[in-house]
Amino acid sequence: MGEGAGDRVLSRLHSVRERIGDSLSAHPNELVAVFTRLKNLGKGMLQPHQIIAEYNNAIPEAEREKLKDGAFEDVLRAAQEAIVIPPWVALAIRPRPGVWEYVRVNVSELAVEELRVPEYLQFKEQLVEEGPNNNFVLELDFEPFNASFPRPSLSKSIGNGVQFLNRHLSSKLFHDKESMYPLLNFLRAHNYKGMTMMLNDRIRSLSALQGALRKAEEHLSTLQADTPYSEFHHRFQELGLEKGWGDCAKRAQETIHLLLDLLEAPDPSTLEKFLGTIPMVFNVVILSPHGYFAQANVLGYPDTGGQVVYILDQVRAMENEMLLRIKQCGLDITPKILIVTRLLPDATGTTCGQRLEKVLGTEHCHILRVPFRTENGIVRKWISRFEVWPYLETYTDDVAHEIAGELQANPDLIIGNYSDGNLVACLLAHKMGVTHCTIAHALEKTKYPNSDLYWKKFEDHYHFSCQFTTDLIAMNHADFIITSTFQEIAGNKDTVGQYESHMAFTMPGLYRVVHGIDVFDPKFNIVSPGADLSIYFPYTESHKRLTSLHPEIEELLYSQTENTEHKFVLNDRNKPIIFSMARLDRVKNLTGLVELYGRNKRLQELVNLVVVCGDHGNPSKDKEEQAEFKKMFDLIEQYNLNGHIRWISAQMNRVRNGELYRYICDTKGAFVQPAFYEAFGLTVVEAMTCGLPTFATAYGGPAEIIVHGVSGYHIDPYQGDKASALLVDFFDKCQAEPSHWSKISQGGLQRIEEKYTWKLYSERLMTLTGVYGFWKYVSNLERRETRRYLEMLYALKYRTMASTVPLAVEGEPSSK
């Protein structure tokens, strides 16, 4: 395994129980002291830092040295939680990402036993229920459906599903000539709206295919490389070849070479290249129902932020890639991309009430808005993303009808976004038999600690019973799952990934999930997005700078007037600015940034603080945002920050926001993203793309985007004083050595160029769609058994829970 101390121990001993048992024999007094201390804390749950703190307090430092190289300390450091129900202490041990073991120690008798997942979850349930629940409890277990399906075993393989799948299935399917027939049948069946592509009926066998390809290759070798397809299509048809091989002799020859190589010596990389050249994606539907989805005047509204920006940038990049591939294949087909969202009739000042809206900067992408509907008619009010569940089934039926009218065909790919979009995408893909891709953006279970165990406390406001069930259904139904980072899937050595947290959990009184998802599943693929380079570009590119916007940016930052767009003033405009921009909700933690700034006088001396969030002119109806709004005012008053802080209302103009990042660069400032958890961190990418040194949360995607100390800095939002000290250190260094600012700025730009661009993203997404579409056709990747199980979960559990979520009461104005 070779992945650190935990893996070293794993390779030496067979189980956690044996490791603890051996340690008890070798160091009985020390282990008894630790477990007794944990037991004496009484009934409850301990987090990793609490477990280690109790260990350090129980054993003197000199004695701990004896345990340093032993198994016990490794076990404790790998523990993600401890459940204490005297005289028992149970530990959930995670030696490496995606691998878990469970053990329980009877402290009175010094008995150690290993627990199966259901046993551990049943024990954990006693934290909220009196005594063990011996009644029959629904247990969800998806593992049997995947038992015969290949999966990698190394943590480094997580998120590289398509490479693993290609390697495995290539060797399985293409072990002899006869096994190549699925590929032949796939090419023969390939068509668009009844138009035959690739092969016609003249080719019925592999030998006929190879013969035709060789003759075509021979013919192409007599032509100029740029000879258009129209000049050799008659010869191709005679041979049994149709459109799709290439728009010119050179490209057609390259495609034919790939297929001949594949037929001669099957190879996973050749297969991926070949499938990447075949025209497979013409119509795409992207689902994002909740929030205010529009191209202007919506960012900062409730439930409206990075996801909207992500999708708009995504479709522009996808259209470019689809047009390029279709042209290179020699086809005259117009692709279509539909972003399907909710129609909001009363969203004045936005286009959210408009049924169809063309996406700017594209030719064939549209936003299609479909209203929520009940038996009483169209729902006009904005509805929180936590309360959409009772509307989605009817919404899916309405969307299916609207899509059919717009596309006049089934889509080739359906992409879901967030929990609600993923459920609608899942239902549509299931109904239409279409390739289904899931993008979570954020799984709420990881954002609200213990929201599974204590779900009943959250239910009235958040309805997590519906949401977590939806997430399980969508992630298990999807043909492939895209994440922006490894951490989304499997965290890191210390923290649990978003998807990983769904491997095993319990919602007492509802169900136990003993195997919800496998992070080693080859459906997981890391495909990182970028920033829109027409808006976000380096501050040094002076010829592109929008200097005409500087007067209004200066008004925004430095005006001594307070109004509905900006509150509080900056007394010293010569200081650098630390800047943050996000939705005003608890998880984004902008109030935490204000507090750490308020507590550090030296930081106030060095820099001004500018936060962009909320709307001073239009109070939110979202309860969480209301609470954060009040907290922000209270903190500014408590720390007497007027003169040091500028609080600007959410800014809807992305073009001006791009120049705002660059203007902050001119002040030699920095961007701070202080979220408790951030799935990806699009604002982090935007800031770095503009050259703005960035400090971002260590929890989630930014930890991967930023290389600490090279292209930015990681901060711990739970340790505000340490974060503010890091900021002070940075700005002190910049004062003493101005080149330090430029060094970090340049490091950020280099990091973006290497890994985070939309061009790389769209190329990968199109290839993934082709590869998964092919394997779905030629193998049991369709996972029919899983889908029957999901139908039952949806029909018997989800629908009942969704029906308990209150419907919106019409009559009140439905503004933000």
UniProtKB/Swiss-Prot annotation:
The reaction(s) catalysed by this protein are: an NDP-alpha-D-glucose + D-fructose = a ribonucleoside 5'-diphosphate + sucrose + H(+)
Which keywords does the record carry? Glycosyltransferase, Phosphoprotein, Transferase
The residue ranges crossing the membrane are: none
Mention one GO biological process in which this protein takes part, according to its record. sucrose metabolic process
Q: Which residues carry this modification: Phosphoserine?
A: 15
What are the boundaries of the region GT-B glycosyltransferase?
A: 280-757
Say what the protein does.
Sucrose-cleaving enzyme that provides UDP-glucose and fructose for various metabolic pathways.
Matching NCBIfam families, A to Z?
sucr_synth (TIGR02470)
Could you name the domain of life of the organism this protein comes from? Eukaryota
Q: Which EC numbers does the record give?
A: 2.4.1.13
Q: Protein name, please? A: Sucrose synthase 2
**Which organism does this record belong to?**
Zea mays (Maize)
**UniProt GO molecular function:** sucrose synthase activity
Glycosyltransferase among the record's keywords? yes
InterPro entries recorded: Glyco_trans_1, Sucrose_synth_GT-B1, Sucrose_synthase_pln/cyn, SUS_EPBD, SUS_N
Q: Known SUPFAM superfamilies for this protein?
A: UDP-Glycosyltransferase/glycogen phosphorylase (SSF53756)
The UniProt entry's sequence similarity note says: Belongs to the glycosyltransferase 1 family. Plant sucrose synthase subfamily.
